[in-house]
Structures are given as structure tokens and as C-alpha cells.
Amino acid sequence: MKKLLRLFFPLSLRVRFLLATAAVVLVLSLAYGMVALIGYSVSFDKTTFRLLRGESNLFYTLAQWENNKLHVELPENIDKQSPTMTLIYDENGQLLWAQRDVPWLMKMIQPDWLKSNGFHEIEADVNDTSLLLSGDHSIQQQLQEVREDDDDAEMTHSVAVNVYPATSRMPKLTIVVVDTIPVELKSSYMVWSWFIYVLSANLLLVIPLLWVAAWWSLRPIEALAKEVRELEEHNRELLNPATTRELTSLVRNLNRLLKSERERYDKYRTTLTDLTHSLKTPLAVLQSTLRSLRSEKMSVSDAEPVMLEQISRISQQIGYYLHRASMRGGTLLSRELHPVAPLLDNLTSALNKVYQRKGVNISLDISPEISFVGEQNDFVEVMGNVLDNACKYCLEFVEISARQTDEHLYIVVEDDGPGIPLSKREVIFDRGQRVDTLRPGQGVGLAVAREITEQYEGKIVAGESMLGGARMEVIFGRQHSAPKDE
């Protein structure tokens, strides 16, 4: 059962369109049909009344008043089997003349009807109607079919009442004309039955037209789906921007996404290439050290720090490239709130272990209220690179201070090292540029730090420290949306 449902649900756009339009057509057809039928019924009643009134006028002209009695002489050309029956009453409601003697029908005429012109209906048993129309064989066959379906069925007869005022030759008369053929057997009544057939035929004709309309209307979507399949099969690079107005925005955004993903792929590929290139130097140093050990030119104790330093460098480079490869331009920055002091404590603790032999003395002057708004890894990456450089080039002391405004976070790192020449203070942030080429490094740490701070609309400013070395001021922007502690 579930497999069968999956074949039909969720419904395709074409099926949804067909069902919706078919429902609209059905409702409108029913509404228009009902209005037409009701209008036809009203028109039919008026037409029937006019015909019966004409019959009444005919009998009024044939009527003669002699010796206080009413005489009606029917011409020979009048069909005695006429589908109407005429009754003539005086002003007191007394029956003066009847075309035929049908007692049950005469009893159905209400006295109130005789007072004014009007159109009425009477209900008769199907057997009584059959006796009334005993001379019409075709009607008898139809009544027999009705009787077979429902022996207690009732037939409806139309009645027209016309009042004629008194004249010099004729007293006031009321002529009642009864249509002996039931409304149910008239062809006009069959319109209700034919309506179902017409509606069905209408739907059978409309649905194919709706299918064609759906096919033509949804062609742009089918073309888009085809292009997406070609993308999956790597047979095209972008979607065709020449599409309908409604799909233009979707196609444009999808093309942007495709370009972004392609750029990301290119970035991964470039990152792998850069990583491979950056590992050549530490690997070459490791190979050279191993050869020296094998030839006993270097002792294990002398080789160990060199190898550990290179292994550490390899680990740092791998971590750096993995992190950078996962970053995407235009990505929304996290708005998480992180206290600065604990993050810097963790970093300085790790750096003290790394530079334990050097004996670096790191001091922190950070207020507990100062916080960073953003991704924690970004903060650690930036400050890790800046502090690593400070520890690497300092003689002994590294000082860290911070301050915060509504819009920015300022962190200052100072050391007592050789400092940075004025001419190099901008170059050091370029990828691959280094001030001291004698020390190990790839010249990417500060470049990475600058790229991350620029994502926060910030920057890193290199200057001269009061300690005699370098002063690096790291500025993080986008701090105005920081949530406030309650």
C-alpha cells in the first residue's frame, strides 16, 4: 500500500494544476448550469401560463349566455383529445361547464384560486393521471414506466386561472385550464436529466484541453528540471538564465549557489596544492635531520627538538589549511558571546608549554566584562597566530591588554623582541611574506589573522611597543549586536 501511495504522492505540479482547474471548471459549470436551469424553469412556467391563457381565451370566445345558462359549442376542428381540460365557473364559484367530467380533478381546484388570475399546480396520483390521459397511448407508456419505478409516484399538473369581467352579453366568469400532461413527462423536465450528461461531456472535453494548457504552462519548469538533471550528469555548468519571469529569481540564485560551490571546490583544490607546497620545507628538514642521524653527524638529543619543531609545524599547517578550506566568503558570522579572558588564558597556557625552554613570561591585563561576539574558533585562530609570533620573537616578556566599545573589540599584544621595521609593517600581512627569514615559518599566520579580522570588518595594526619590540593591535568589528547579560 505504501509503495502504491508513493506512486501518486506527493502530486506533481501538472496533476495539481489539472485537479485544481478541473475543480474550478466543475464548480463553475454546476453554478452556471443551475442558474440556467432555474431561469429556464421560470421561463417555462411563464410560457405554460401564456399557452393556457390562450386556451382560456379561446373557450371564452366560444361561450354563449342564453336563458341564464352557459353554452359552449366546440367547432369540429377542435381536438377533443386536447392535452388540456377547461372548467368554467361563475362569480360565486359554481361550476357552469366542464370539458370533461373528472370529479377528482374538480375537487382539487381551490375556491381561493377562482378569485383572481393566477398560475397554480396540483399533485395527482399516477393512476388518476393515467385515467385522465386514457386516450394517449404514448403517455400511457411513459406513465407505466413511472408506475413500475414507483407505484405511489405523484404527477404535477399546471393550472391557469383567468377571471373575465361581466359584459353586456356575458356575466362574470372564471375559466380554469388544466394541463393534463404532467410536468414530469414534458421534454422541458428532461432538461434536468440531460444536464448531468452535458456536464459529463463538458468535463470530458475540458480535461484534455486542461492537459494541453498544463503542458504548455509548465514547460519552463520541465526545462528547468531537465537542466538540473544535466547538472547532475556534469553536462552543463550553469542553468539557462533565459526563463520565465517567475523563475528568474530562482535560476539566478541557483546559479549563484553553483558558482559558490564551484569556487569552494576550486578553493579546496588550491588549498591542497598550497598545503602540499608548504609541507615541502619541514619535510625536507626532517629528511636532512634523519640523514644526519644515520651518518652520526647529529646526536638524538640535538635532532629531537628540530624534528619536534617540524612536526609541530606540519600539524599547525594541516590544521590551518583545513580550517581555511572550510571557510566560505559571505558566510554569516556567528553572533555567540564569548568572554575574552578565559580564551586568552587557554592560549597563553598552551604557548607557555610550547615555549617552555625559552622561558617566555606572558602577562594578561583583561577585564572579566570584556567579551567577543562571533565564532570562537575565529578568535582563537587570530589570537593564536598573533601570540605565537610574539612568543617566537620576544626576548622574554609578552603583555596582553584589551578594551571594548559598543562597536569594536581592541586587543593589544606587545613584546620585547626586535620589533618590526616600519617598511615591513604592511608587508607582513601578505601571504608568504616574513620579516625574519632565518626562523622557521611559512609567512601565512598573520595573513590568516588579517583575513579573519576583515570578515568582522576589523583589522590588525602593527606598531612599536613600549617594551621595545612589536606592538600588534587586533581590532574586531561587528560587536554591536552582542547580547547583553541580564
Curated annotation (Swiss-Prot):
Q: Where on this chain does Mg(2+) bind?
A: N385, Q442
**Which terms are listed as keywords in the entry?**
ATP-binding, Cell inner membrane, Cell membrane, Hydrolase, Kinase, Magnesium, Membrane, Metal-binding, Nucleotide-binding, Phosphoprotein, Protein phosphatase, Transferase, Transmembrane, Transmembrane helix, Two-component regulatory system, Virulence
Topology feature Cytoplasmic, residues: 1-16, 216-486
Q: Which GO terms describe its molecular function?
A: ATP binding; metal ion binding; phosphoprotein phosphatase activity; phosphorelay sensor kinase activity
Q: Which residue numbers mark the site Plays a critical role in the switching between kinase and phosphatase states?
A: N202
Query: Membrane side Periplasmic: which residues?
Result: 38-194
All copies of domain Histidine kinase, residue ranges: 274-480
One Pfam family of this chain: HATPase_c
- Annotated TM spans: 17-37, 195-215
Where does this protein reside within or beyond the cell?
Cell inner membrane
Q: Binding residues for ATP, per the UniProt record? A: 385-393, 415-420, 434-446
Q: What is this protein called?
A: Virulence sensor protein PhoQ
Annotated organism of origin = Shigella flexneri
Its gene? Answer: phoQ
